[in-house]
């Protein structure tokens, strides 16, 4: 009887049953692996959305994981570039303030130079007028004289010539030595006469 059992071939039904029993055992590890993969992918997606810079990392780095060294370097570079831009903007603002402060200073300097030039011109004109007024007091003039500066200088030159001629003559030495006031009056009168004669002779000659 034992020989019949051992030697009897396995029926197809029994083989199918054994295969069907082994298939669930194989499917169970495969399904377990798939579940583990789904859990890992869900954890990665959750970490990428909740992590700091996840959106920027997804947009910039593409498939890089959040918090990776490459993403950290890129974040540092972008932060450094922003800081440099801010520093450049600050430098530009400083240059604008310096140029804006320089233009009013130059305008004030020009105004100061103009004021100083006007003051010097007024002082020069005032001193010149005072000198001509003193010269008119020295030169004997007629009541009808309204001399300009050039005419005053010409009359002064003629008066110097007249005084030279008086000093060369010997007739008025004894008469003018008596009184200086009388001498001055006589000189003024003589100069007026000499001047009128000279003007008459000049007009007659022309």
Curated annotation (Swiss-Prot):
Q: What's the chief localization of this chain? A: nucleus
Q: Which Pfam families match?
A: HLH
Stored InterPro entries = bHLH_dom (IPR011598), E-box_TF_Regulators (IPR050283), HLH_DNA-bd_sf (IPR036638), TWIST1_bHLH (IPR047093)
Q: Which SUPFAM superfamilies would you find in this protein's record? A: HLH, helix-loop-helix DNA-binding domain
Which residues fall in a compositionally biased region of kind Basic residues? 34-43
Q: Where is this region: Sufficient for transactivation activity?
A: 165-195
Gene Ontology terms: biological process = aortic valve morphogenesis; cardiac neural crest cell development involved in outflow tract morphogenesis; cardiac neural crest cell migration involved in outflow tract morphogenesis; cell proliferation involved in heart valve development; cellular response to hypoxia; cranial suture morphogenesis; embryonic camera-type eye formation; embryonic cranial skeleton morphogenesis
Task: Report a single Gene Ontology molecular function.
Answer: bHLH transcription factor binding
Q: Where is this region: Disordered?
A: 1-109
Gly residues bias spans? 48-65, 78-103
**Ranges of biased composition (kind: Low complexity):** 1-18
Keyword vocabulary terms for this entry: Activator, Biological rhythms, Developmental protein, Differentiation, DNA-binding, Myogenesis, Nucleus, Repressor, Transcription, Transcription regulation
- Changing residue 186 to A/K does what? High transactivation activity
Q: Which Gene3D superfamilies match?
A: Helix-loop-helix DNA-binding domain (4.10.280.10)
Q: What induces it?
A: By TNF-alpha.
In which tissues is this gene expressed?
Subset of mesodermal cells.
Entry GO terms, CC: nucleoplasm; nucleus
Coiled-coil region: none
Give the subcellular location.
Nucleus
Q: How does it assemble?
A: Efficient DNA binding requires dimerization with another bHLH protein. Homodimer or heterodimer with E proteins such as TCF3. ID1 binds preferentially to TCF3 but does not interact efficiently with TWIST1 so ID1 levels control the amount of TCF3 available to dimerize with TWIST1 and thus determine the type of dimer formed.
The record describes the protein's role as: Acts as a transcriptional regulator. Inhibits myogenesis by sequestrating E proteins, inhibiting trans-activation by MEF2, and inhibiting DNA-binding by MYOD1 through physical interaction. This interaction probably involves the basic domains of both proteins. Also represses expression of pro-inflammatory cytokines such as TNFA and IL1B. Regulates cranial suture patterning and fusion. Activates transcription as a heterodimer with E proteins. Regulates gene expression differentially, depending on dimer composition.
PANTHER family for the chain? BASIC HELIX-LOOP-HELIX TRANSCRIPTION FACTOR, TWIST, TWIST-RELATED PROTEIN 1
**The name this protein goes by in its record:** Twist-related protein 1
Gene symbol here is Twist1
């Amino acid at each position: 009887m034992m020989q019949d059992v051992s030697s009897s071939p396995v029926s197809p039904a029994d083989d199918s049953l054994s295969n069907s029993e082994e298939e669930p055992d194989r499917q169970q590890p495969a399904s377990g692996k798939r579940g583990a993969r789904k859990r890992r992918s869900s954890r990665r997606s959750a970490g990428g959305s909740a992590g700091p810079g996840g959106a920027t990392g997804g947009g910039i780095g593409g498939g890089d994981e959040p918090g990776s060294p490459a993403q950290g370097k890129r974040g540092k570079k972008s932060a450094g570039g922003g800081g440099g831009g801010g520093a450049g903007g600050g430098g530009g603002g400083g240059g604008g303030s310096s140029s804006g402060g320089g233009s009013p200073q130059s305008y004030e300097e020009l105004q100061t130079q103009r004021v100083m030039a006007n003051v010097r011109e007024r002082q020069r004109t005032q001193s010149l007028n005072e000198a001509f007024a003193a010269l008119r007091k020295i030169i004997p003039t007629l009541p009808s004289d309204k001399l300009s500066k050039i005419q005053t200088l010409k009359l002064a030159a003629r008066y110097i010539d007249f005084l030279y001629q008086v000093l060369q003559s010997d007739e008025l030495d004894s008469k003018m030595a008596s009184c200086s006031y009388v001498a001055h009056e006589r000189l003024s009168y003589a100069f007026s006469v000499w001047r009128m004669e000279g003007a008459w002779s000049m007009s007659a000659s022309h």
